């Protein structure tokens, strides 16, 4: 789980004198998150200058996520974060060694939100599906933050818990050793890559999102039959394909692949009846 350029917004955040170290045309989903997933970042009231030592790493991450939700990547910088916290921007470095450390903490907060309320059950297929869906919904709820840090390996407590749950489901399926590690990495990378890709699209300015969405009713809808015969056959259906439908289709393909190769089929009542 790695990426390059994920900290570009923070790399520019030393502007204004702050000190310290340095898509595919799809419409936003109408799906809603499970009720047991934590909602948006908590808001802090009062912007007066804070007393030295009154800041905490948790508060800094919460306020960072609020700023990213409200103003996107363009609305997030260390000077703005300092003003929102009522503190000097350099105070951040008493809690985070670098901007990248803050980025990783934000990424771990997103995973924490996705994991809230998730309790693995006897059905390993459902555990895999729920975790992957939760990551996607959380990233869609916080697209700017997700696009900043979606592919990072945080090594934080939330990520460690998510990895433990995911590997546990893979072990339940009968995979062992190197094969279990490979299947886990494939599922984890699929989840973060897909959710991160959607987040990058949703983090764009609304007019750019609209320009991408309109392509399916523009160039593709009017594709020349002789030049693009395959596009022409499905041109009327392409604009109606939703984000949710695309995701659920690829998720089912991925999970079915894991099921087909699993040494130990799921024995929960739902899948036992289906397999029988």
Go through each PLM region and give its residues:
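Basic, helix-initiating cap at the start of DNA-binding domains
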Residues: 1-80, 84, 97-104
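C-terminal peripheral helix-coil segments that are non-catalytic and often amphipathic
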Residues: 1-44, 200-276
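Short hydrophobic/aromatic patch on the recognition helix
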Residues: 86-96
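Short amphipathic alpha-helical interface segments enriched in basic and hydrophobic/aromatic residues
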Residues: 69, 111, 115, 136-140, ...
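Hydrophobic alpha-helical connector segments
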Residues: 116-161, 177-180, 184
